[in-house]
Amino acid sequence: MNTTVYALATPAGRSGVAVIRLSGGGAGGMLDALAGLPRPQPRMATLRALRDSGGSVMDRGLVLWFPGPGSFTGEDSAEFHVHGGPAVIDAVLSALDEAGAHPAEAGEFTRRAFENEKIDLTEAEGLADLIDAETEGQRVQALSQMSGSLRRLYDGWRDALITAMASIEGEIDFPDEADVPDALSHAAYEPLSELIGSMFEHLDDGRRGERIRIGFSIVLIGAPNAGKSSLLNCLARRDAAIVTDIPGTTRDIVEVQLTLGGFPVVISDTAGLREAVDAIEAEGVRRALDRAEHADLRIGVADARSDEELVDLEGRLTDGDLLVLNKLDLGLVSERDGAYRLSAKSGDGVEALEARIEQIVRDRLSVREMPALSRVRHRRAVETALEALSRCRDQLADAPELAGEDARLAVRALESLTGRVDVEDILDRVFSQFCIGK
């Protein structure tokens, strides 16, 4: 890239220190213009007076010089660590603008790092996730991805596939060689089968990586006035939902975001399940059932005194879901093995339920040996590669030309994951998620 760009890398507003980044072919000259000569030693913080084009001192701060290609972006880069007052920041940014630099777009520094092959697309996504991480589980997954865990996996698949493709192309180029078909079967079939198995394992992860990014979904369902909203407030430790004695108080979905076991969790309170009395309640019930259908975990909440509620609720729960008998403080009538007996009003018994929820979240989202798919685009690309590889393997003996074409389709799908091929629309989407200055 020919242009030199700048951006404030720290949050806007008043602060102790502000960091301003600069990258591009003109970074060295602009650093000299503001901080004077001699230029600082690479990657060594140096205290300098920063001057505008008229020679007036704007501030005294630390400057750093990162000559390319040994920088984050792969280009000549510099940083100015100045006092974080708005007037100081504006003065330095204006001086850089006057020197010929341009304001960076969102994610432009990271995009330049990608285009200069300092990072691949999965590592860029990992960096974005690390910046957004709010829980320990998100931090660990993002750091692993940023450090190249997915890149190494996908590049390994690609290399193995290209090796297998050499055998397929050999069959196509030398069809009259008597020993080629046997060599093809031996050299390509088994590696392709191993690749297919590895991809199946990668996909069959219960969407663990995506859940770590966006949150493990838990939905509270049950009849009106069963105490779902009270339980939500108890788990959230705040008044997130309105609680009254009037059945049907909750009409729309109320969400609360929590951290359990170091992982993000989204708990949803829903409308009570019953024959709706009006169109608004009917829509609330429809949304409740839809949210429950797509939840990672359903918690059925029933009044401990009502057998009728229990029978209806048990028909809506599946293996792995939890059943809560609420309002224990009013007297227990119904009994169910494995049910959690509690009073959401007083909090008695809620601790055991919370511990069980946390254990379920840990079990389903815990780190495993194979890196996790963290985005929908990853899953779709691997599914595309898997479908192409399956066709390729099935056609090895009878149609090697078609097998070769499917192998190339699989390679392209894998390369789209790391950004080896031209995927401009994907790049725009990924880098637009970054803040200015990153």
Curated annotation (Swiss-Prot):
One GO CC annotation: cytoplasm
GO biological process: tRNA methylation; tRNA wobble uridine modification
Domain TrmE-type G, chain residue ranges per copy: 215-362
Annotated transmembrane regions: none
Domain of life of the native organism: Bacteria
One Pfam short name: MMR_HSR1
Name used for this protein in its record: tRNA modification GTPase MnmE
The organism of origin for this protein: Maricaulis maris (strain MCS10)
